[in-house]
Every structure is written in structure tokens, then in C-alpha cells.
């Protein structure tokens, strides 16, 4: 899950400053609704995969700084217990529901505990906003401008990129390769539309090596492993950074965290048909900064476009240079400066 991955990256960052700091990662859904957390996550996955238009509509119509939540008294008590248990000095949120609930808690209890929100996509929909949020950490100037338009004070916004684990930042040189390496990723469930046709057509090119990361999708893993023996098929792995570093191109969805993992490993992106509001925002950022190519329409031919791009060394190098520029623009001391204030 993206918000947990972001939280783990932030924890690594904090501990790299001071190994004695105690950082606790709490899945807010599991903590607040332990009996229903699996159902909530399953429902969310169904909503985004099967009813994406409804999901986009809900995000667009969410009210700015709306701190009203159901079961308010119960949730305030639970947050009280949580903060007491961990002797909390400050809270960092990587998911909208946590930002909303903690903001509501602060307003209700008149609490001064600092609340910092990391927005893990380029598009900042209204559910991220809370009246009592002390600082927003965002991925780009586009996100900052969007928050200002929504009424957030400029001095409460820090551009710092979207958090990724330290392993993605240790960009070591890769040995010379004889073939182009293409990495295909479809998130935790490994879902890429038309994956078999993509593999069939790309696999026929003798100058390309293919790696497919299936995540926890065992059915897809077995199916592709059997049907395409020359493709390097990988299940769930914590070494995604290694696969990215040795790849020349990543075919994937436009997740915010994945985008910045690619930026830190200098690996150009080929994005497949973004549709969710946050995916579209991330894709526009990728296109505007020329760090990848976007397949906006089902009509365009993915395999032909990928083969054309992978052969264009000049274009790939321009994309890598643009990724280098984005990395240089990020404020790497953002967190230390805030926490030590």
C-alpha cells in the first residue's frame, strides 16, 4: 500500500538524522476500524478499479478543509489512546483519512500537537486538507500552486518530492548491457491491461530483455512464467530499486511514489492509460517535465511506441537529464529543518 510505503521511507529519513529517535508506523484504517479494515481496503480497491468515474467524482466534490467526520466522539477517544500509547511529539500523515481525522482531533481537543501531511501524488484533492494541518510536504511546484488556490497559506507548503526509501537514492553505476532492459510493473496486484499481448510483441524483439514484477498476484506469476519462459517474472519483492536501476525504461501506472522512485533511479517512464484523478495529475507532471511518455488513449499502439522510444537514445538521455534536474530542485533537508525547529 502506497501510504505505508511512504511512511516507511519517512521513517528511514528521520532515523538517518538521529538513530535514537523512535518512529512508529500506524495503519490508521486498521487502528480505527480493526474489525472492518480488510473490508474497507477491499471496497476501496473495487471502487478505484471498477467504478473509477465515481471515485473521481467523489474526490472532485469533497469540501475544502471539511473536518466533519462520523463517529466523532469514538474517534477522538481512539486518537487520545493512540497518542498516549506512543508518547507522541508530532504526527506525520501519508493518507488523507489520517490528515482529516487528526485535524478534527486537534480542533476538538484544542491540541497543539504538530500535524505534518505528506501528499503522495502531484494532484492534491480536497480530502488531504485539514484546518489544523501545520505543514504540507508536496512533490512539486504544481502541487504547491494547487494548494494555494485551495486556500492553504504559502508558508505552510514545502516542496520536497514524494518520499521514497533510501535504497532508491543510492543510485550506483550499472555495468554495461548488451540489450535494452524494460521493467513492467502493475502495482501490488501486478495489474497491467493487455499484459499478454504486450509481452508477446515486445518479447519478439531480440534487443530487449523483459522483467515483469507481478507483486502478490500469484495467478499472474504462474501464468506468465509458463507462457513466456524467456521473460524474467518476479513476484513480491523488496528489491524494486535494483530492478529500476538496471532498467532503461519502466512500463507502469502513474503512481506518485513510483514516479519519484523512477526519478531517483534515473529511469524513464512509459505510462499506461491514466484515468484516476491522481494518476492523470501524475501523468501530466511526467509529460510536462519530459521524464516519460504517456499512453493516453487505447487507440495508440503500446508495443510500437515502446520499441520506438527504447531505440531513441537521445530522447532517453534527455528524460534522464530532466530527472536529474528534478532531484536537484528538491529540498533534501525539508524534514530535518521542520523537526528541529
Positions of predicted regions on the chain:
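Conserved N-terminal ligand/cofactor-binding loop architecture of enzyme catalytic domains
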Residues: 9-86
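C-terminal "capping" alpha-helix adjacent to the active site of nucleotide-linked donor transferases
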Residues: 288-290, 298-314
Amino acid at each position: 500500500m502506497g501510504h505505508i510505503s511512504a511512511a516507511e521511507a519517512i521513517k528511514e529519513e528521520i532515523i538517518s538524522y538521529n538513530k535514537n529517535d523512535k518512529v512508529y508506523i500506524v495503519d490508521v484504517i486498521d487502528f480505527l476500524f480493526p474489525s472492518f479494515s480488510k473490508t474497507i481496503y477491499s471496497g476501496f480497491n473495487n471502487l478505484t478499479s471498477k467504478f473509477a468515474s465515481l471515485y473521481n467524482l467523489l474526490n472532485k466534490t469533497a469540501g475544502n478543509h471539511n473536518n466533519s467526520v462520523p463517529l466523532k466522539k469514538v474517534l477522538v477517544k481512539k486518537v487520545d489512546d493512540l497518542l498516549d500509547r506512543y508518547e507522541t511529539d508530532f504526527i506525520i500523515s501519508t493518507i488523507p483519512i489520517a490528515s482529516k481525522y487528526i485535524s478534527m482531533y486537534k480542533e476538538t481537543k484544542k491540541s497543539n500537537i504538530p500535524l505534518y501531511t505528506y501528499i503522495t501524488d502531484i494532484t492534491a484533492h480536497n480530502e488531504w486538507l485539514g484546518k489544523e494541518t501545520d505543514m504540507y510536504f508536496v512533490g512539486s511546484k504544481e502541487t504547491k500552486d494547487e494548494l494555494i488556490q485551495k486556500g492553504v497559506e504559502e508558508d505552510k507548503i514545502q516542496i520536497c518530492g514524494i518520499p521514497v526509501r533510501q535504497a532508491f537514492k543510492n543510485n550506483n553505476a550499472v555495468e554495461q548491457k548488451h540489450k535494452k532492459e524494460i521493467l513492467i510493473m502493475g502495482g501490488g496486484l501486478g495489474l497491467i491491461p493487455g499484459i499478454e499481448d504486450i509481452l508477446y510483441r515486445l518479447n519478439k524483439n531480440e534487443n530487449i530483455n523483459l522483467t515483469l514484477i507481478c507483486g502478490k498476484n500469484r495467478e499472474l506469476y504462474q501464468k506468465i512464467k509458463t507462457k513466456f519462459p524467456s521473460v524474467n517474472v518476479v513476484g513480491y519483492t523488496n528489491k524494486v530499486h535494483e530492478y529500476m536501476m538496471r532498467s532503461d525504461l519502466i512500463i507502469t501506472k502513474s503512481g506518485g511514489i513510483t514516479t519519484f522512485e523512477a526519478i531517483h533511479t534515473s529511469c524513464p517512464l512509459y505510462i499506461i492509460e491514466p484515468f484516476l484523478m491522481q494518476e492523470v495529475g501524475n501523468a501530466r507532471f511526467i509529460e510536462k517535465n519530459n521524464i516519460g511518455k504517456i499512453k493516453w488513449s487505447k487507440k495508440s499502439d503500446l508495443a510500437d511506441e515502446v520499441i520506438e522510444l527504447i531505440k531513441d537514445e537521445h530522447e532517453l538521455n534527455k528524460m534522464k537529464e530532466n530527472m536529474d534536474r528534478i532531484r536537484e530542485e528538491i529540498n533534501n533537508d525539508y524534514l530535518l529543518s521542520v523537526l528541529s525547529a
